[in-house]
C-alpha cells in the first residue's frame, strides 16, 4: 500500500525534532453545496529542526516514531 503524502503549513516548531503541520481539506457541503474548509493538525518528524512556522511542507506517512508522531517531513514547498 502506498504511503499517503499531504501538504500543509507549519504552525508549531517548539518541540525538539518535531513540527506541527496544519493540513486543510475542502469539500462541498452535502445539503448547501457550499465549499467548507476543515483543518487537522499532525505532528511530523523534522530531524534537523530546519522548518520554521509559516513554511509550506509535504509530509509522508511512516511507522510510529512516538506516541503522537506518525508522519515525516519530506520537503518544503516555495514560500
UniProtKB/Swiss-Prot annotation:
The keyword Ribosomal protein applies. Gene3D superfamilies: Nucleic acid-binding proteins (2.40.50.140). GO terms for cellular component: cytosolic small ribosomal subunit. GO terms for biological process: translation. Pfam families: Ribosomal_S17. Keywords: Ribonucleoprotein, Ribosomal protein, RNA-binding, rRNA-binding. The keyword ATP-binding does not apply. InterPro entries: NA-bd_OB-fold, Ribosomal_uS17, Ribosomal_uS17_bact/chlr. GO terms for molecular function: rRNA binding; structural constituent of ribosome. CDD domains: Ribosomal_uS17. Part of the 30S ribosomal subunit. One of the primary rRNA binding proteins, it binds specifically to the 5'-end of 16S ribosomal RNA. Belongs to the universal ribosomal protein uS17 family. This is Small ribosomal subunit protein uS17. It comes from Rhizobium leguminosarum bv. trifolii (strain WSM2304). The gene is rpsQ.
